[in-house]
Amino acid sequence: MKKNNQMKPDNVAKRLWAFFIVLTMCITVQPVVPAKAQEAVQTAARTIYTEFKHGNSIHSGDGSYGNPYNLFEDAYAAAGNGDEISILGSGAFLNAEAAEPFIFDKSVTVNGNGNTFSNRKGGFILNTDVTFKNITLRFSNRLHDAIFANGHKLVLEDVTCDSGFRYVDIFGGSLYENGKNMGDHPGSGAQILITGGGTNLGNIYAGSMNGTYDGKTQIVLAHVSGTQNGEIYASGAKEPYVNQGDWFSMQEPDPPAADGQYTVSGDVEISLTGSDTKQVYGVSENHAGKTFLTIDTDQSYTGTPGISKVGNLTVKGGGTFAPAALDSCTVRLEGASAIDLSQMETPQVHSIVSADSAGNRLILGKEQKLNVTDTITGALTFETLNGRNGKSGIAEYGHTYLELGRAADTAVSFIPTDGQAGMTLERTSSGNGEIWKTSELSGNEPVAVKNMTIKNPVLLANVSNIRNSDKSYYLDVEWQEIGRASC
C-alpha cells in the first residue's frame, strides 16, 4: 500500500508557523553582553575639572579642562562613581548656605594637583569610599571642621591644612546631632589611610562625634612627617562649643574632647609606618574592642611621646622604638627590632613576645627595673642604654633588671660591654615568677677611676727625637679610685 505524500492543510500551517518563529528569533536575538561588562562601559572613569574664578554664586562651566565648573558642588553633581574631580590653578570652592556638612555619596577621587580646596560647609561626611590627594584644605567654618569616614574608606594622600584656616580633624565614625547620624549610609569597617611627607592635620578619632560607632576602625599613617599632626584616639569625641555667629574669628576652636561614652564597638588598629604623631590613646578596659598599635620603622623612632591604654603594641621593621610613656600592655617584637624603655621612670608591661629566633632587643636604663606582670616568650636580648656593636651599654653589678610574674620560656641573652666582660645575667626563681639580675663583682674587674689629673700636661721634646729614639717619657698622673668597674 502506497503512502500518501500529500500534506494535510493543518500540517502545512503548523510547519509554516514554526518556520516563522525560527525566522523571527534569528532577526531579533542580539549578542548578549554580560551585565558587569555593560556596567563597566557605563561607569568608565572620567575627569571633571573645577576652578573657582567667577564668584561665590556663579554656576558656570561644563567640567571640561577649557571650561571648568566654577563651583565644586557643580563638579560633584556631574560626577559619578569612579570619576576624578580635578582642581585647577585657582583652586576649588564649596559654598555654604548653612552649617550642615557636605555629603559625599559617590566614590570619587578629588585631585588637588597641589592647589587649594576652600570649604565653607560644616565638614565632610562620607557615605561611600572617597580619596583626596595633593590638596591644601581651607576649612573656614568653625563648626565640626572635620572629615567623617562614617565607617567607609577615607584616603588622604599629601593632604594638609593651610595656615590661617581650621585644622581638620578626622573621624572613623560619623557626626551626630540630637542623637541622629547625619550620614545616610554608615559602614562598619572604617579605614583612614594617610600618606605624604608634608601632611599636617588635626586629631584622629576612631569613633564618632557626639555619638557611638558600631564597627571597627583601621588607622594607617605611612611616611607622614608633618610636625603639627595631632593625637590619635581609639574612641569618639564630644564637639566643643563654637560661636556660630563669629564667622570671621581667626582663633582656632578647641579640638573635640575624646570621650569614653562615645565607644567603638570593634577593634581599633593603628599603624605608624615611618610616621609621627603626638600621642596615642587607646580605649578603656570596659570597651568591647581592643586597641592594637603597630610601629613599623627601620631606624630609631622617638616620635610618639606616650601611649595610653593600648592593649597590644607591635614594633617591627628592624628599628628601635623609645616611647616616653607606656601603659601595661603586650609588647610584640618582630624583625630584629627593639623597644627602648629607658625614658620611663617605672616601666611595666604585661608581657613581651619575641616573634623571631633572634635579633629582637629590650633596652633599659642603667639603674632601671622592668616589671613584666606575665612573662617573656621567645628569644630576646637584653641590654642597657648606649650599647654598641651587639653589646650592652654599661650595667650595674648585682642589679635586678627584670621581674617576671611567670617564668620565661627561654633564657634572655645578654652580652656585656668590653669593660665588663665577665658580667652575666642570671635568672632566679621568685614565687611563681622569676627575677633576672646581673652577677656580683668578682674582684677581677678593671679598676674604675674618676678625677684623673695629668700634673705636667706640657711635654717639651723634639718630634724627630721622639720618633727616632727609644727614650721613655713619663707623665705624672693622679686619680681617685672608686672601686671595680660597675659604672
Sequence positions of predicted segments:
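N-terminal secretory signal peptides that target proteins for export/translocation
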Residues: 1-12
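Bacterial N-terminal signal peptides
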Residues: 18-28
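Sec-dependent signal peptide cleavage junction
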Residues: 26-44
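Acidic Gly/Asp/Thr-rich repetitive segments characteristic of extracellular carbohydrate-active
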Residues: 49-88
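Extracellular beta-strand-rich solenoid/capping regions of secreted or surface-exposed proteins
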Residues: 94-109, 116-156, 168, 172, ...
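All-beta strand scaffolds that present successive hydrophobic residues in beta-strands
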Residues: 110-112, 130-134, 153-162, 187-196, ...
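Acidic/polar low-complexity surface segments
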Residues: 137, 144, 165-184, 205-214, ...
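Conserved small/polar residues in nucleotide/adenosyl-binding loops
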Residues: 485-487
